[in-house]
């Protein structure tokens, strides 16, 4: 049973779906305890089973109630292993696992800040089980340094990409055309298209890109179109701030907020370059790997897990985070490189992604970790 706050959108959520599918294909049953979200339909279509409860809550009384619900579920369904993917639900999941003597695993999907002893204790819940899974070597090194964990208790399993879904040969032109029309891009628009995919939240670096675009416009560059694909998930103030910043810079024709996208393979094919301008380190950065699987060049912040997934000058470029001038320079370089050279870089990224970041390899490693824990507990 996996426990995740929500199944809306994001790397942890996609990995939850991937692992649930792998468990089912291996002959097991896959439960996911979560508040819910738009990806529940995919879970259930794969044969996974939803256990809906407010595991996203940080209210201690709600967390205790969740633990009780999880205990009942573990006993009723004879759950053999509990896997938490976030801190707040990890407390409920850990208590339930301890009460039922069920093996407990936690995945570090992010690098959590710890500016006090209390916060460090809160974060440490992820390390209190049988095994910690880190989603990159960067994350593994952070956990070891932060918590002094026995290295034998932590394993790095890089996130994987579904290469059946993210395969440029399997996306018909009708899908990219439908997206082009939905996003209001003219059929004869020949500008270089940049895509920043991800929920509208400050750490994703949208404001850096808006300022970079303003600098490019000031340098008389008008041969680009930037698309922000993602919804605000209730952060309406930030969405309004982005809209105002675009208008203030006179970039309404060059920067568009297009909302949530369900067809990311088509979105990457529709565009020329993917952007990942995060202002804080991504522990892995699936948004840097998926476009490479689709043969697209990536420009990413030079920190965190993207240092592992993007090869500077070969599959894309690494740029100082939060530096609009550096981002303007990198984006201008990508435009001037030309389509043929960008595609050659994209082919390098696609080849590397297929070698290192396959979802089947990630799932096999995760199920292998489960098996070792169950054997050790037997």
Feature roles, as predicted:
Residues 98, 104-134:
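A conserved, positively charged/aromatic
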Residues 84-90, 108:
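Short His-centered aromatic/hydrophobic patch
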Residues 333, 340-356, 365-368:
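A short, well-ordered alpha-helix in the C-terminal region of glycosyltransferases
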Residues 312-313, 317-325, 332-339:
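Conserved acidic donor-binding segment of nucleotide-sugar-dependent glycosyltransferases
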Residues 32, 297-300, 310:
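Short hydrophobic beta-strand element within catalytic cores of glycosyltransferases
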Residues 234-241, 251-261, 267, 317-318:
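Active-site donor-binding acidic/aromatic loop of nucleotide-activated sugar
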Residues 10-18, 192, 196-215, 226, ...:
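A conserved mid-protein helix/loop that constitutes part of the nucleotide-sugar donor-binding site
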Residues 33-38, 161, 197, 225-240:
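Glycosyltransferase donor-sugar binding loop
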């Amino acid at each position: 049973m996996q426990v995740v706050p929500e199944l809306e959108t994001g790397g942890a959520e996609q990995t939850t779906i991937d692992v649930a599918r792998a468990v089912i294909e291996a002959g097991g049953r896959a439960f996911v305890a979560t508040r819910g979200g738009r990806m529940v339909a995919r879970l259930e279509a794969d044969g996974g089973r939803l256990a809906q409860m407010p595991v996203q809550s940080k209210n201690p009384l709600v967390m205790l109630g969740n633990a009780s619900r999880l205990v009942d579920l573990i006993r009723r369904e004879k759950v053999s292993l509990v896997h938490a993917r976030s801190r707040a639900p990890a407390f409920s999941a850990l208590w339930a696992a301890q009460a039922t003597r069920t093996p407990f695993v936690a995945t570090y999907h992010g690098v959590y800040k710890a500016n006090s002893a209390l916060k460090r204790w809160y974060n440490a819940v992820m390390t209190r089980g049988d095994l910690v899974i880190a989603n990159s070597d960067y994350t593994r090194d952070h956990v070891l340094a932060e918590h002094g964990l026995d290295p034998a208790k932590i394993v790095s399993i890089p996130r994987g990409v579904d290469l059946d879904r993210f395969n440029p040969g399997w996306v018909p032109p009708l899908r990219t055309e439908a997206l082009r029309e939905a996003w209001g891009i003219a059929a004869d628009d020949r500008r270089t298209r940049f895509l920043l995919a991800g929920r509208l939240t400050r750490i994703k670096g949208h404001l850096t890109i808006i300022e970079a675009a303003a600098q490019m416009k000031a340098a008389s560059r008008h041969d680009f179109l930037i698309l922000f694909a993602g919804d605000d998930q209730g952060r309406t103030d930030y969405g309004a701030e982005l809209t105002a910043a675009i208008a203030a810079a006179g970039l309404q024709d060059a920067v568009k907020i297009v909302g949530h996208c369900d067809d990311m393979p088509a979105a990457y094919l529709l565009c020329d370059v993917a952007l990942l301008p995060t202002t804080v380190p991504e522990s892995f950065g699936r948004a840097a790997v998926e476009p490479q699987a689709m043969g697209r060049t990536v420009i990413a912040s030079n920190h965190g897990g993207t240092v592992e997934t993007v090869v500077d000058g070969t599959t894309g470029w690494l740029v100082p985070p939060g530096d609009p001038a550096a981002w303007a320079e990198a984006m201008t370089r990508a435009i001037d490189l030309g389509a043929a050279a960008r595609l050659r870089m994209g082919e390098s990224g696609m080849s590397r992604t297929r070698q290192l970041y396959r979802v089947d390899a990630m799932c096999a490693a995760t199920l292998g970790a489960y098996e070792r824990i169950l054997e050790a507990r037997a």
